[in-house]
């Protein structure tokens, strides 16, 4: 089977003519539909790209807003913690000051009570001494003793006083 040059040229002309006829038929009957489908698809892709871009921008705005809210919340939480620490410190200082004042007041009251007790004891001792002195003077006067006897009597009463 050998193909001659004439057959080859004939086949070429036939195939080329068939392709041209096919292209003319496609242009006449199908090209409008194909072009419409391609145009519709192009518009759909363009809309999808625009929607994706809008969604991306919306997501960025939402992210920025969320970040701002998060930052504000962190700032507010820090302020609340700071205020709580400050209030706690003030209350602690107040309690310490009140406790110190109460301790001073109790100490002063105790010192006052001690001074009063001391004063009462001294007063009682003075009263007791004066009573003993009066009693001693009465005994001395009633006993008409000489100086040695008076001295012994005074020493005896002072010893009794020391034991009391």
UniProtKB/Swiss-Prot annotation:
GO terms for molecular function: proton-transporting ATP synthase activity, rotational mechanism; proton-transporting ATPase activity, rotational mechanism. It is a single-pass membrane protein. It comes from Streptococcus pyogenes serotype M49 (strain NZ131). The chain crosses the membrane at residues 6-26. It is found in: Cell membrane. One of its GO terms (cellular component) is proton-transporting ATP synthase complex. F-type ATPases have 2 components, F(1) - the catalytic core - and F(0) - the membrane proton channel. F(1) has five subunits: alpha(3), beta(3), gamma(1), delta(1), epsilon(1). F(0) has three main subunits: a(1), b(2) and c(10-14). The alpha and beta chains form an alternating ring which encloses part of the gamma chain. F(1) is attached to F(0) by a central stalk formed by the gamma and epsilon chains, while a peripheral stalk is formed by the delta and b chains. Keywords: ATP synthesis, Cell membrane, CF(0), Hydrogen ion transport, Ion transport, Membrane, Transmembrane, Transmembrane helix, Transport. InterPro entries: ATP_synth_B-like_membr_sf, ATP_synth_b/b'su_bac/chlpt, ATP_synth_F0_bsu_bac, ATP_synthase_B_chain. It comes from the Bacteria. This is ATP synthase subunit b.
């Amino acid at each position: 089977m050998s193909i001659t040059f004439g057959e080859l040229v004939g086949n070429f002309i036939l195939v080329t003519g068939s392709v041209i006829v096919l292209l003319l038929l496609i242009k006449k009957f199908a090209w409008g539909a194909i072009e419409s489908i391609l145009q519709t698809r192009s518009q759909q892709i363009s809309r999808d790209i625009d929607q994706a871009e809008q969604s991306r921008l919306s997501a960025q705005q939402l992210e920025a807003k969320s970040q701002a809210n998060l930052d504000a919340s962190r700032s507010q939480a820090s302020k609340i913690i700071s205020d709580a620490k400050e209030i706690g410190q003030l209350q602690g200082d107040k309690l310490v000051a009140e406790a110190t004042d109460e301790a001073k007041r109790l100490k002063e009251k105790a010192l006052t009570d001690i001074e009063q007790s001391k004063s009462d004891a001294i007063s009682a001792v003075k009263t007791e001494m004066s009573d003993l002195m009066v009693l001693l003077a009465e005994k001395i006067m009633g006993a008409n003793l000489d100086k040695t006897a008076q001295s012994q009597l005074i020493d005896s009463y002072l010893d009794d006083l020391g034991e009391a």
